[in-house]
């Protein structure tokens, strides 16, 4: 075992070098979960007053009354899908369901699925950030109640243009959100209705390292960047029944039924200088894993040559009055960021369904805690 005064081990040196290389691709600062107003209102990153920043908008349309009951899939487009699939199998214990030479489908335990779809640099559906070779192009959720004609009618009534996508017993519609993001709404007879069928399917790519033995137990949060977070939060709340936690002034964490959470973050419509980005994009995903031990998880990442960046998202005032990041061992939210083979910002945390609001509580501005 190295002494405290020893230099980094060979695995730590590899991780450090990898971080240095990834910094050139924009991974020098993880996409953290706190909003711009965590440290207060009417200040540099959050110039509006609390009253204006958190002011409600008129709902984008009337609620459908639907409830989201399952995650059907999250679709990634990337330039080496088999390396990515093998990485998640080894790191997070996902199971390969299928691989047809063009894409791989993996199950996340018994509660979710991902699609890794092979593309070339010139045919991404959603352009990836500069230097990256991977992007999330859409997500799909199961809703109830389901009646095909009624679902289509309700979508059309709200000005959406549903595009049917049916395969076997799966019935679904694709619609576009306010930023043009692809949302698939399903009946539950697709991936969600047939999980556990991955037995006997072998990876075409060798595992990049020894399996960690971890299990992915929870969709901690999806970090979803949009042009107008209030508008998007209203869209998903009223369309799919997602429950808002609180409006922070730059983001709103929504509870996706019993599935997990999503951080809808972006421009505030009451800020005159708000800039319009290219459209919605998903900058990182955080998965809750088990078992969790702060030091053991970090060591497991480092020994596999992976970059590691701690993220508590919470902070406290230091002696000089400036905010200091909370120590991960005592923080209410414990997590690490790392990077996948194709350059995606992957976050793993200790979050479970039972403590799903720990992050939202930890980063809630003090002004919102006041009566």
Where are these regions (language model features)?
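Core segments of cupin and vicinal oxygen chelate
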Residues: 75-120, 165, 171-174, 223-270, ...
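A short local loop/turn or secondary-structure capping micro-motif enriched for an aromatic residue
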Residues: 114-116, 122-126, 191-194, 263, ...
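Short beta-strand/turn micro-motifs at beta-sheet edges
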Residues: 60-64, 124-129, 208-211, 270-275
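N-terminal secretory signal peptides
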Residues: 1-11, 24
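Non-catalytic surface loops within mature trypsin-like serine protease
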Residues: 78-80, 110, 120, 143-145, ...
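Vicinal oxygen chelate
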Residues: 15-64, 69-80, 104-107, 126-217, 224, 298-371, ...
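Structured segments of extracytoplasmic/periplasmic soluble domains
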Residues: 84, 90-95, 142, 154, ...
């Amino acid at each position: 075992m190295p002494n405290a005064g020893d230099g980094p081990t060979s695995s730590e040196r590899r991780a450090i070098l990898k971080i240095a290389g990834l910094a050139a691709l924009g991974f020098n600062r993880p996409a953290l979960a706190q909003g711009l107003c965590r440290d207060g209102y009417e200040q540099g990153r959050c110039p509006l007053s609390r009253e204006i920043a958190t002011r409600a908008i008129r709902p984008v349309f009337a609620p459908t009354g639907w409830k989201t009951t399952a995650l059907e899939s999250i679709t990634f487009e990337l330039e080496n899908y088999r390396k990515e699939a093998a990485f998640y199998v080894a790191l997070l214990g996902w199971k390969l369901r299928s691989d047809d030479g063009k894409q791989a489908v993996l199950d996340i335990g018994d509660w979710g699925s991902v699609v890794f779809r092979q593309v070339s640099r010139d045919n991404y559906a959603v352009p990836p950030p500069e230097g990256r070779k991977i992007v999330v192009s859409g997500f799909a959720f199961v809703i109830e109640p389901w009646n095909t004609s009624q679902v289509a009618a309700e979508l059309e009534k709200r000005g959406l243009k549903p595009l049917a996508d049916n395969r076997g017993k799966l019935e679904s519609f694709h619609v576009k959100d306010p930023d043009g993001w692809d949302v698939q709404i399903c009946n539950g007879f697709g991936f969600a209705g047939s999980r556990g069928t991955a037995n006997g399917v072998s990876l075409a790519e060798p595992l990049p390292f020894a399996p960690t033995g971890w299990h992915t137990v929870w969709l901690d949060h999806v970090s979803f960047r949009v042009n107008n977070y209030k508008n998007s939060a209203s869209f998903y709340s009223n369309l799919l029944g997602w429950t808002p936690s609180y409006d922070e002034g730059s983001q709103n964490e929504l509870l996706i039924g019993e599935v997990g959470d999503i951080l809808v973050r972006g421009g505030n419509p009451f800020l005159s200088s708000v800039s319009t980005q290219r459209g919605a994009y998903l900058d990182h995903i955080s998965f809750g894993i088990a078992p969790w031990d702060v030091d053991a998880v970090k060591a497991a990442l480092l020994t596999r040559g992976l970059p590691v960046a701690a993220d508590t998202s919470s902070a406290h005032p230091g002696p000089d009055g400036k905010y200091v990041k909370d120590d991960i061992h005592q923080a209410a939210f414990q997590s690490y960021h790392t990077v996948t083979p194709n350059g995606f910002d992957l976050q793993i945390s200790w979050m479970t369904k039972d403590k799903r609001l720990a992050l939202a509580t930890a980063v809630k501005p003090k002004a919102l805690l006041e009566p």
